[in-house]
Amino acid sequence: MNLETPSQENLDFMLAEITTKLKMVNVGVFENLELDSVDYNALTDIYQLIKRKSNFSPREMQLFAEELRRIRK
């Protein structure tokens, strides 16, 4: 899967991976998120950072959640 190419499928995949890895409880925030309403490049950057780490402190989880809120256009 080439995540560099913006698509709804890639968006859904990255959001699912991020919410699973961060063990986010309120994943409903990201349901039905449309490709044109998101800064795709910022999401890709966040995804790559999260993918590299195996463990997160509570503070890191909070910071990533805040960044995810900001990716909406």
From Swiss-Prot:
Top-rank taxon: Bacteria
Species of origin: Listeria innocua serovar 6a (strain ATCC BAA-680 / CLIP 11262)
Protein name (database record): UPF0435 protein lin1819
Lineage: Bacteria, Bacillati, Bacillota, Bacilli, Bacillales
Similarity section: Belongs to the UPF0435 family.
Pfam families for this protein: DUF1128
